């Protein structure tokens, strides 16, 4: 049991397959993060410039927000992992409570008049 203490941590803790998997996962997260930055810049450019017509700017930003929300859920909140069942259940139930609440508040406050 004490024989493993003489080895360095990276050699004793992970196999080569685990290291490759972690590197692949880090690479995916960096790519998704860069994609989210790009989506944010696209939404900023939609508002800052007149490239996109004003009537299409709000739906365009909303579409980008939904895409970014889905990417964040799957890659950073680990919704794609199978061993996060309870966390997934709570996040999904939170979405099902939040969306109707926001829609009801928008209707009550008259925000839907553009």
Curated annotation (Swiss-Prot):
GO terms for biological process: aerobic electron transport chain; electron transport coupled proton transport. Keywords: Cell membrane, Membrane, Translocase, Transmembrane, Transmembrane helix. One of its GO terms (molecular function) is cytochrome bo3 ubiquinol oxidase activity. It is a multi-pass membrane protein. Its EC number is 7.1.1.9. The chain crosses the membrane at residues 29-49, 56-76, 89-109. GO terms for cellular component: cytochrome o ubiquinol oxidase complex; plasma membrane. It comes from the Bacteria. It is an enzyme of class 7 (translocase). The keyword Transmembrane helix applies. It is found in: Cell membrane. It catalyses: 4 Fe(II)-[cytochrome c] + O2 + 8 H(+)(in) = 4 Fe(III)-[cytochrome c] + 2 H2O + 4 H(+)(out). The keyword Membrane applies. Belongs to the cytochrome c oxidase bacterial subunit 4 family. This is Cytochrome c oxidase subunit 4B. The lineage of its organism: Bacteria, Bacillati, Bacillota, Bacilli, Bacillales.
């Amino acid at each position: 049991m004490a024989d493993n203490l003489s080895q360095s941590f990276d050699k004793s803790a992970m196999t080569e397959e685990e290291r490759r998997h972690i590197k692949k996962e880090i690479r995916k997260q960096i790519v998704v993060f860069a994609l989210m930055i790009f989506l944010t810049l696209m939404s900023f450019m939609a508002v800052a410039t007149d490239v996109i017509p004003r009537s299409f700017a709000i739906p365009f930003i909303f579409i980008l927000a939904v895409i970014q929300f889905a990417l964040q859920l799957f890659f950073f909140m680990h919704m794609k992992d199978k061993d996060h069942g309870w966390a997934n259940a709570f996040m999904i139930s939170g979405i099902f409570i939040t969306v109707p609440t926001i829609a009801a508040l928008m209707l009550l406050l008259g925000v839907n008049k553009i």
